Amino acid sequence: MEPTEYRDELRSVLDTASGVVSDRLAAIHNAATPRTEGIVIDVSLDQDGEGTFGVWARYEGPDAFSLNQQIGDERELFGVIWGEEGWEPPVPHRPRKWSRVELEKVVVGVVAKWIDGLIPSTATELPWEVTTPDGTVDAVLVGPEISRGHSPR
C-alpha cells in the first residue's frame, strides 16, 4: 500500500465518525472556561505500532483537571481496537515498510486535517492543536483561526 492510499483509506474511516465527533468538539468548546488556555487533541498509537490508536481531547490551563473530569469519556473522539475479525473500525493495515514513527506521523497528520474541519467555526478564542501525549510528533495547530491563516494567540 502506498502512503497516499493509506491516508485516503484512513480518512474515509475517520469521516464515518465526523457527525459524533463534531458534536463532541462543540460540547468541549462550550464547556471551556475563561481560564482555559487551549484544547489539545492527543493521538495515541499502541506501543508496537501495529495499528490501534485513540484520539482524545483534553483541556489546558488551571481548570483542565475539573473540565476533563466533567466531560469524561466524551473526550474520546475516535478509537481503533483489535476485534475478533480485525481492526474495529476497519482502518487500513500499516504498510510493512513503515516504522512506528512513520505510522505515528501519518496518523497525526490525517487526524489533524480531519479534526480541523470539525472544530466549531466560533471556536476562535482558544488555540487547538493535534499532537501525541509524549510529544514525539510536532504539534499541528488546527481550528478556524488557523484555517484563515492566523494564530489565535
Task: Give the label of every model feature segment.
Residues 1-37, 45:
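N-terminal domain-onset segments
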Residues 27-68:
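Amphipathic, interaction-prone secondary-structure segments
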Residues 64-127:
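Amphipathic protein-protein interaction modules
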Residues 21, 41, 57, 128-130:
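Generic structural hydrophobic/aromatic packing signal, biased to beta-strands
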Residues 1-12, 32, 101-153:
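Acidic, proline/glycine-rich low-complexity IDRs
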Residues 58-64, 76, 147-150:
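Short, low-complexity, polar/charged sequence segments that are solvent-exposed and flexible
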